[in-house]
Amino acid sequence: LLVVSKNRSLKDIMPCILEEKHRLFGENRIQKAEKKFVPDVISNFDISLHLIGPLQTNKVDKALSLFNTIQTVDRPKLVNEIYKSIQKQKFPIVTQNFYLQVNIGNEPQKSGILVDELLELYDKCLKFNLNIIGLMCIPPANVQPDPYFEKMLILRDDLNPNLKLSMGMSN
């Protein structure tokens, strides 16, 4: 279970870490994750940190040095930037895994690759040897999510049945 700790302080989430033994956390902003999950917290408690918010190309280096997994790879330009950063290796790279974010509801206000462009993005990632371990989506708000979850399952099975699915809801 990925615990989304956005808008919570380290003090707020310490009971999750200490008492409930949660080790898998999601953050939607790099700056907030940096302040909350300092190196001592990550190493002392063996925290695995996932980026679940949009990633700007100018922040790729920072994200690769902080998050174990980036769940919001959603466009070819971002894949190019990730690949370039990994090739340069000017800093310790923490990120080992990536998810492709799918705009499953085709909503213009949301990030994510469109369904009909997913295969091309997936192939590009494989060409660059990025370890794609799953697909991520956030279904439209205020509607029954099941049809979107089913569509993601079909997409995953068509693309690669071994991929994981991360299908979150804010409400």
What are these language model-derived features?
Residues 1-171:
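Conserved alpha/beta-domain cores
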